[in-house]
């Protein structure tokens, strides 16, 4: 999802699916059905539709929580990053039943339309299917490891990060907004090569759009996307550490009913009892559990369901941990159990 520092390169890195212990829990992936994406009562600093155009560059990113017509559940990640100097596509697939995992990263030439959302790197990309660049969008990946073709609709109220949609990010600023629960259909190809149809009544996509006025990024960050079942709450939680700029930020943007937004400080503590050693760098060890307190809102104990959920590249630009997580916690004094994603980005010096 994230806006990363540009680096030169041409590479394709992938791993085949891996077997793991079967995970029997099922999840409620019902999409929202909002009538409008953004009413405009809160004055954000950009037009959502305009930022979709290829000329804006930056990051186009989705996580899709899907249920097939055979009642199998998958977690899909898809990401196009475009900067003046480099472009990449990466994707992953996690079977939430048996925890089979596959991923790839491809750095190469981007073809795009300056005035609309139409981005392609190799056989993968994002494409607007509506004139407004927003109402209906396609994400597709044709790699042998991760193959899917998804259509997602803007049936959800937007979430502009930090309330206005813009915040400090390294030495510059970044803008970021999300459509957190889009109706989704299409198909994916399973590990055995069989094609599976997605049930749109039991599937949704979080679409995240980000760019900025400075290509530099913080040294490290951990970002969480959390969904609170049986409520309208969607959380985007940033924890940013950048020693060069002295930026150590922890904040959550909470979207509730309608355009209800809260921007709240966060207490963040990674737990290194369980860890995963990066495939990309011997200097990177990922924690697999975290304790978070969102001030005035709730507390969460978050855990990755599978240790190896790393998208493996050859640099910090290409590599990220994009893991499906579950959590237990309390919101409004009530016990909650939910799911989401953790994204972990490590600084370039770990690859040198």
Indicate residue ranges for each PLM-predicted region:
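Fungal secretory targeting signals
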Residues: 1-20
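Structured soluble/peripheral alpha/beta segments that form catalytic or ligand/cofactor-binding pockets
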Residues: 21-352
């Amino acid at each position: 999802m994230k806006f990363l520092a540009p680096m030169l390169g041409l590479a394709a890195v992938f791993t085949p699916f891996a077997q793991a212990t079967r995970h029997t829990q099922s999840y409620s992936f019902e999409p929202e059905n909002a009538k409008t994406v953004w009413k405009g009562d809160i004055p954000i600093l950009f037009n959502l539709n305009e930022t979709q155009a290829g000329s804006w560059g930056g990051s186009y990113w989705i996580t899709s929580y899907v249920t097939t017509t055979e009642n199998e559940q998958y977690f899909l990640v898809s990401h196009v990053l475009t900067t003046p100097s480099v472009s990449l596509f990466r994707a992953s697939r996690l079977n939430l039943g048996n925890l089979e995992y596959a991923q790839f990263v491809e750095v190469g030439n981007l073809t795009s339309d300056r005035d609309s959302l139409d981005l392609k790197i190799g056989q993968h990309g994002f494409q607007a299917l509506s004139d407004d660049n927003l109402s209906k969008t396609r994400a597709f990946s044709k790699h042998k490891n991760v193959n899917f073709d998804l259509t997602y609709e803007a049936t959800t109220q937007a979430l502009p990060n930090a309330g206005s949609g813009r915040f400090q990010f390294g030495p510059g600023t970044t803008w970021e907004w999300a459509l957190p629960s889009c109706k989704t259909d299409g198909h994916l190809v399973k590990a055995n090569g069989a094609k599976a149809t997605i049930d749109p009544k039991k599937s949704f996509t979080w679409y995240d759009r980000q760019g900025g006025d400075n290509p530099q990024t913080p040294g490290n960050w951990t970002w969480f996307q959390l969904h609170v079942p049986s409520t309208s709450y969607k959380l985007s939680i940033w924890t940013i550490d950048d020693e060069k700029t002295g930026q150590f930020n922890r904040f959550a943007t909470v979207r509730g009913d309608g355009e209800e937004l809260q921007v709240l400080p966060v207490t963040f503590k990674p737990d290194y009892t369980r860890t995963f050693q990066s495939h990309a760098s011997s200097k990177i060890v990922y924690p697999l559990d975290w304790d978070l307190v969102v001030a005035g809102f709730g507390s969460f104990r978050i855990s990755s369901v599978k240790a190896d959920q790393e998208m493996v590249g050859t640099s910090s630009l290409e590599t990220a941990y994009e893991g499906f997580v579950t959590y237990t916690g309390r919101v409004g004094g009530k016990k909650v159990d939910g799911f989401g994603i953790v994204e972990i980005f490590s600084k370039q010096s770990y690859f040198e």
